[in-house]
Amino acid sequence: MADPLPEALGPLLREARARLVAAGVGDPALDARLIVEHFSGTTRTQAIADPERTIDSNAIAAIDAALGRRAGGEPVHRILGYREFYGLRLSLSPETLEPRPDTETLVEAVLPFVKAMAAREGTCRILDLGTGTGAIALALLSAVPAATATGVDISAGALATAARNAGELGLGGRFTTVQSDWFEKVSGRYHVIAANPPYIPTRDIGNLQDEVRDFDPRLALDGGVDGLNPYRIIAAEAARFLEAESRIAVEIGHTQRDEVTDIFKAAGYASVAALRDLGGNDRVLVFQWG
């Protein structure tokens, strides 16, 4: 059994880090700081300026439990219950994929088009397929006040999380949700269809990092036998929901650029752009109809 955690902030941070080092956590200093700050309500500045600051017993107990969860492999943002994405704080739930920085590449890929369309037409209607936390749609809405978005997900729990995030960010008036298996219950036409679909081949799910495999919902990971099923569905069905001038943007696995491009071209789309993520991997493809 671990020794009791110190009550003073500075020693508490050091002990939290030591526990995570011992557990083999990848970034123990950062995760320890995030956990201590979140559950104690303190800041990094306070830790530097007042390391002897006393932390109350309830916070100590919460930190102790959180460190145990992190040492057991649970991702730190699952423990905190939120993650930052494109400068927005998004709540997480068991039904949602944890949004990651690579997906910000998709936001950047379509943002100029969304801005231009909103400036010209007075609005830009966005459809976010598999919305999860609402990350993609809400990032675009936060950047373009004239835009509106519909978040689609098969999971009612994910949609509840996305709607809650929209409300907390003051974007609820421009964000609606539809529970649907892809386009099944979608109506209307959109200037942008965006998706970060499941793209992991079924056979590879077991080889994912523990933090992904054990805590992200399988529904948001499994793209079928070859990982390409969602792209086939989107390419086959999207055209009837698109405005005459429009874009489709999809996140892809880093080895899938050619295969996904071929799927969309075979369905009548033209390639507009291919973007890499911060790690230099192929990550986002943008298409237009015709």
Swiss-Prot record:
Residues bound to S-adenosyl-L-methionine are: 130-134, 153, 182, 196
Q: What CDD domains does UniProt report for this protein, alphabetically?
A: AdoMet_MTases
A Gene Ontology biological process noted in the UniProt record is: methylation
Alphabetic keyword roster: Methyltransferase, S-adenosyl-L-methionine, Transferase
Q: Indicate the enzyme's highest-level EC class.
A: transferase
Q: Which residues bind substrate?
A: 196-199
Q: Pfam families this protein is in?
A: MTS (PF05175), PrmC_N (PF17827)
* Catalysis: reaction(s): L-glutaminyl-[peptide chain release factor] + S-adenosyl-L-methionine = N(5)-methyl-L-glutaminyl-[peptide chain release factor] + S-adenosyl-L-homocysteine + H(+)
Q: Which GO terms describe its molecular function?
A: nucleic acid binding; protein-(glutamine-N5) methyltransferase activity; protein-glutamine N-methyltransferase activity
- EC number(s) in its UniProt entry? 2.1.1.297
| Family annotation (InterPro entries) | DNA_methylase_N6_adenine_CS, HemK-like, N5-glutamine_MTase, PrmC_N, RF_methyltr_PrmC, SAM-dependent_MTases_sf, Small_mtfrase_dom
What is the protein's known function?
Answer: Methylates the class 1 translation termination release factors RF1/PrfA and RF2/PrfB on the glutamine residue of the universally conserved GGQ motif.
Q: Which family does it belong to?
A: Belongs to the protein N5-glutamine methyltransferase family. PrmC subfamily.
- PANTHER family, A to Z: HEMK METHYLTRANSFERASE, MTRF1L RELEASE FACTOR GLUTAMINE METHYLTRANSFERASE
Entry protein name? Release factor glutamine methyltransferase
This protein's species is: Mesorhizobium japonicum (strain LMG 29417 / CECT 9101 / MAFF 303099)
Gene name? prmC
